[in-house]
Amino acid sequence: MLIEAQAEQCTFVTRGLCAAAVLCQVEPVGRWFEAFIKRRNRNVSASFQELEDEKESSEESEDEEFQLEEFPLLKTLDPKDWKNQDHYAVLGLKNLRYKATQRQIKAAHKAMVLKHHPDKRKAAGEQIVEGDNDYFTCITKAYEILSDPIKRRAFNSIDPTFDNSIPSKSEGKDNFFDAFSPVFERNSRWSNKKNIPKLGDMNSCIEEVDGFYSFWYNFDSWREFSYLDEEEKEKAECRDERRWIEKQNRAARAQRKKEEMIRIRTLVDNAYSSDPRIKKFKEEEKARKEAEKKAKADARRKEQEEKERQKQAELEAVRLAKEKEEEEARQQALLIKKEKEIQKKAIKKERQRLRTSCKNWNYFSDNEAESVKMMEEIEKLCDRLELASLQSLNESLAVSSKEEGKSAVEKQIAEVNAQLKREKEQEEARMKQSTKGAENSAIGGGSGSKSWSEDDLQLLIKAVNLFPAGTNARWEVIANYMNLHSISGIKRTSKDVINKAKSLQKLDPQQKDDINKKAFDKFKKEHRVVPQSVDNAVPSERFEGPAADMSPWTTEEQKLLEQALKTYPVNTPERWEKIAEAVPGRSKKDCMKRYKELVEMVKAKKAAQEQVLNATKIKK
């Protein structure tokens, strides 16, 4: 709307004549109309069409810019050895190589065909080799490989011009970035991921450096080596031969892939160990930790100095008193040692004197057997007689004749043998008394009121080992455990359990072995496998699984089983087969059975402890 003019302002009015309307027909033309028709036919937006136009124009510009490079050795190539030729060089794309587009490859092939086709050369008067032996076959093979994305990818993976070398640690120490940056840039072409981090420079932060090395330590490579397969499965005459060729090729590819990943890992390791930024970050972190450590150490040192000053006087007094006691004890021990040495030398001298005297008299016999027997008796005297007895015997031998000496020696031998016999009888009587008391104790059960069967004794031993010293309310827990698992029906109190445990500790080792042997014999009797009758008319089945091992588990086997259970979690395929392999001498069935037993033991242990805990809470 126009603003109305004021009173003092002048108003101008312009009038003119308009020509009459004329109807005419216009046809749309031009590149804009053509673009509109394309968008309408393809049902796309204008922005999408602009992107495609830019892409086509960029490809056309690239196609216009590249120039084919003539391969001078093209005519000398052997068509039969086409697999070892450089396909990019054959098509004149030696400089572009893996960067060449499909349009460029097609254009290069077209140009090579126009120039080297046998018909063209024959028309020009050139001598042509008939069949597939002409070098033009190499051009056809090169285009066949490079036009197929899968085959081209395989050839690019073993590009003969690619430099697989990596810098050593010593090369990277002098000029790290110049040595490693082009190598990482060169090897980044094998990555499946597009956003590849750069090596950076000395100003890169620790997050960027960590991200770079994390990417390369987890490098995902698409490089594969199927082009180097020595055997072609298409040449196989039968299915078995084709499978064998495929197996050999897969093994060779896996080995080359492994070597490639080792090469990449070595590159990253060399770079990481030579990277000056890593060294700088480590030094900074070390300095920070040392500063914190020093501050804490200073605080602790000041606190300790005060305590040390207070304890120093007490420690000094204790030290002096201890040194005095040690010196007195040392002097006393030295005196005792000297006395023992003197006595030992005297006994040794008297023993040797006795042996010499008896030897001079040929051990009082001309019979060799009697001499040997007397020699044994003389050695027994040397071992049993005290110093005074040896001296007395030697003095009597020195002043007596052979017969008198023999009588003196035989008398001494008789006394020693009689003493040995008395000691043996006393020991046998003591052992018999101990055995009798242990049997009465085992029958009475310690408390004298409740009998203990062999099953209850074994259950008690198992419970004592299951709940070691230090367990909260240990004997109450053991009593509850026995009451839950005993088949005798007798209820045991903590006092009964303690008395019986003490009586078992006093048993002779031989009696303990007898009890364990009886328990094991009973176990074998209860778990004896009854052989099944086999019908001769029916073929017997073959079971591949090994029989369960009924022998008890050793401590070493138990440790191996526990380690295997940690190593192979529940979601591991074929878990129990792997666990059985980790425990030598045990089958899968043995391991599963032992695991169930351990689970039941743990559940029983928890149940017994919870019962005692609940009873304690109720009393409170």
UniProtKB/Swiss-Prot annotation:
Region (Disordered) location: 284-309, 420-450
The GO terms this record gives for MF are:
chromatin binding; histone binding; Hsp70 protein binding; ribosome binding; ubiquitin-modified histone reader activity
Instruction: State what this protein does.
Output: Acts both as a chaperone in the cytosol and as a chromatin regulator in the nucleus. When cytosolic, acts as a molecular chaperone: component of the ribosome-associated complex (RAC), a complex involved in folding or maintaining nascent polypeptides in a folding-competent state. When nuclear, mediates the switching from polycomb-repressed genes to an active state: specifically recruited at histone H2A ubiquitinated at 'Lys-119' (H2AK119ub), and promotes the displacement of the polycomb PRC1 complex from chromatin, thereby facilitating transcription activation.
Compositionally biased tracts (Basic and acidic residues) = 420-431
Please verify whether the record's keywords include Thylakoid: no
Name the SUPFAM superfamilies for this protein: Chaperone J-domain, Homeodomain-like
Q: Sorted alphabetically, which keywords does the UniProt record give?
A: Activator, Chaperone, Chromatin regulator, Cytoplasm, Nucleus, Repeat, Transcription, Transcription regulation
User: Which Pfam family is one of those matched by this entry?
Assistant: RAC_head
Q: How does it assemble?
A: Component of ribosome-associated complex (RAC).
Q: Please, one GO biological process term?
A: positive regulation of DNA-templated transcription
Task: From the Swiss-Prot or TrEMBL record, give the protein name.
Answer: DnaJ homolog subfamily C member 2
Where found in the cell? Nucleus; Cytoplasm, Cytosol
List residues of the SANT domain. 447-509, 548-603
Species per Swiss-Prot/TrEMBL record? Xenopus tropicalis (Western clawed frog)
Question: Does the UniProt entry include the keyword Transcription?
Answer: yes
Q: Which residues form the J domain?
A: 86-159
A GO cellular component annotated for this chain's UniProt record is: nucleus
Q: Its principal location?
A: nucleus
Q: Which gene encodes it?
A: dnajc2
Q: Which PANTHER family does the record associate with it?
A: DNAJ HOMOLOG SUBFAMILY C MEMBER 2 (PTHR43999:SF1)
